[in-house]
Amino acid sequence: MKPATTVVLLRPTKSNDRREAFEVFLVKRAARSGFMGGMYVFPGGKLDPADQTDSAKKLVSQSGYLRWQERIHSSDFSRPAVDEALAKGLLVASVREVFEEAGVLLAKVGSTGQVLQTDVTETKTRFLEWRARLAKGECSFADFLTAEDLYLDPVMLTYFAHWITPSREKRRYDTRFFVAYQPIGQEAVVDDHEAVDGVWRTPKEAISDYRQGDIALAPPTLRILEDLSGHISVSHVIDWAAGRDVWPIMPKVGTVNDQIAILLPWDPGFEATDGESILGLPHPHPNAEGPSRVVLEGQQWHSRNDFAQSSVDD
């Protein structure tokens, strides 16, 4: 099982609809991708060895770092603690993946301490060249940041969810989710390699697009969008993310009424379903919010509650 990271980029909308005045950025994985090919997902990926090198770790600001590391330390005592190498690796990988896939760089300028802006044509061109070199493996992410006098501030990413691939799957990831505000003066543009399309949508718009068959979503992405759809602004989302306790969620896959179902740890049928469980979690699960299962009905996933058979988006 490989450690991985996912980043939900946020930006305010220009709409007058105050019920959901923010958007999230979704990228479409290339069809040839071995994992979630053709799906619309949030930017992210697995940790690379280079994300945990000394040169990469030195680029992480110590200001606020210890508190950030403690926050992402799992409360599940049956799993290894999140040490400095993994914590900083997650931060580096998060920023690297967002830059590679979306062209947004969540970094600060060393000489000023200000959030990076790339709206100047010369700067934008230079950073596109760096992005191309990274894609070709001609330089490391640490080399790039060092050359541009940039550093990573943990405050720019807020941890809010932890999903682990079910034990029955061959390709498994231990993924931590973060939310981040897209810096002013930067623009999200996909790389046309790992990602072939990118869209900004409010959570409700993204779910609607899925229901209409315009985009494909995996169950974790659908659940995250549903969780976010109850918020009204970027600041509201970040405050919610910073204030919630995060415990690992490792679903089980079973069959309910002849339908494939992904059962979350607080589902009444979870314990009776075959599959690995995380030991040491309190019951009920501390993150027992919303639906308890995601059911494949026809060609689409629907979030359901065992006690009330109605979908979240009905």
Please provide the spans of the model-predicted regions.
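N-terminal leader/linker segments that precede catalytic domains of diphosphate-processing enzymes
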Residues: 1-314
